[in-house]
Each structure stands twice: as structure tokens, then as C-alpha cells.
Amino acid sequence: MRVKKIASVLMAIILLVSIAGCSSPKKETAKQVKSESKERIVATTVAVTEIMDALEVDLVGVPTSSKTLPKRYKGLPEVGNPMSPDMEKVKSLKSSEVLSVTTLEYELKPVFDGVGIKANFLDLTSLKNMQNSISDLGKKYGREKQAEEVVTKLDKKVTSIQKEVKGKKEPTVLILLGVPGSYLVATEHSYIGDLVKQLGGKNIVQGEQVEYLASNTEYLKKADPDIILRAAHGMPDEVVKMFDKEFKTNDIWKHFAAVKNNRVYDLEERLFGTTGNLAAIEALDELKKMMYP
């Protein structure tokens, strides 16, 4: 319980610092027009905002982020960071629905419920779950065609890349998710863990149902993974320095086969987020290079 509590606190910190155009065709269906006329949707994470853009759905509010949001939403009111949206701001937008992610549901649902805001938490913890969420949004907002295009594109990529790695030796993998001063271990139930699984890799952490766990280096050493992936979020430059220091000063790391064989890789934050996103295709390509050099 203590380990899970620590992991929960660290995950909250990670999410706090890390998650921090086209016109519709003229032949719009009556369902689409009706939907857009009454829906006032607020997206509270960058990943969700990008998905709504791909579906060509308008929003009335977007998250506050250092990342560049889709042009479609330029100038829209910002509602704060994904971990702690400004509830007064959200309420002032008279939203009909607020979109967040299941990774934040435990922390945010009571807050939204407490102020009477209707929130929907999208499951972006894996490629398949993200595809299902996109399909559901397409049906809900009359954007079935756009949703099908996105889902099909992802399906084709997964099928193609799995054929490329079929028959190759499956590497064992350790995934570390870090913020300044600390880090967690990502399980196969995390988004990055799912990407590794899609490519045939075996996460050394098995039998867990949560996305992230507190680190136990002694246990990790016994598993001795072929590859170590280090994901840095929020302040990637600072986190990479933290990881470098940890690996140099903590004697245990030099005994890992992945370290001895120079198979420790830093993941680009733009591609490897804490939740699924539309950069998944590029992320799979990059991950394949690391897992099967």
C-alpha cells in the first residue's frame, strides 16, 4: 500500500508538470449541424485537443500548455493545466461537456462532480483504447467518417510494423517515467508500455493492474532488462540530467545488461506522452529502431 501511495503521489506530480483550421464540408449532415449548434465542448489535455481537431469538432475551451495547439483553436479561452483545470473558467464557458482522460479520473472526477460540471474521461492508456475512444467521439458528434480515417490509419501502421518485427528476438524492456527529482516504473498497462507490447517487447513488470509503480532498483536488477527506456516529461532537459546523474552515482545501474550494452534510450517527449496521442505512428517507428537496431 505504501508503494502504491508513493506511486500515486509521484504520478500526480508527473501529470501536473507534463500534460501542462479546416472547415467542414458543405454537405454536412443534419446530425452534425444539430450537434455543433448545441454542444459547447472543453478539452483539458493536449492529446484530447488534437483528437478533436482530427475529428473536425469545434471547442469552446482548451488547456493551458507550452505546446502548440491546432490552428483551429487559436485564440480560444484557456482553462488551466490538465491536472488542475480552473473550474470557474470552465463554468464561465457554459460547457455542455468537458473532456479529460482516465489517467486523471481518480483525482478530477470528484472535483468536477463537486461543482456540477459534466466530465467525460477518455481512455487513452493504449492504442486500442484510444481508437475506441476516437470511434465513440465520432459517433457522438457525427464525425464517423473522420474517426474511421484516424482509426484505420493507426490499424494499418500497427499491422505493418508488427510484420516487420515478426520472428525477431523479443527484447525485455524497463520503462522509467521521470520528473525532476524522481521517477516511476511504467507497466504494460501504461501507454508507452502498450507501444512496447505492440512491437513484441516484454515489460519486465508483470502482473500489475496499475499504469505506474514506485521504483525498486533491486527488483529491477534481478529482472535485468535488455533495454531501458527513459521518458522525461514536463521539463525534459532537467529530467534527462537527473537520469544521467542517477545512472552515474547509483552503483546498481552499472550492473544492468542494458547499461553495459549501451541500450539505454531517452524518449522524446513529443512522441511519448503519459497518454495516447496522434503521434503514435511516429512513436512506433522510433521505438522499433531502439528495440530492433
Positions of the model-derived regions?
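Structured C-terminal subdomain patch of bacterial secreted/periplasmic proteins
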Residues: E39-R40, Q131-N132, D136-K139, E148, ...
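Flexible loop/hinge segments that line or gate small-molecule binding clefts
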Residues: L69-K71, L108-D136, K140, Y265
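Bacterial N-terminal signal peptides
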Residues: L10-S18
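Bacterial lipoprotein signal-peptidase II cleavage site
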Residues: S18-K31
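Proline-aspartate-enriched helix->loop->beta-strand connector
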Residues: M87-S100, I117, N216-R230
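His/Asp/Glu-enriched short active-site or ligand-binding loop at hydrolase and phosphoryl-transfer sites
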Residues: P63, K67, S190-Y212, D266
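Basic- and aromatic-lined ligand-binding clefts that recognize polyanionic substrates
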Residues: K34, K38-L55, Q146-L199
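A short, structured surface patch at a secondary-structure boundary
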Residues: R40, T44-L93, E97-T102
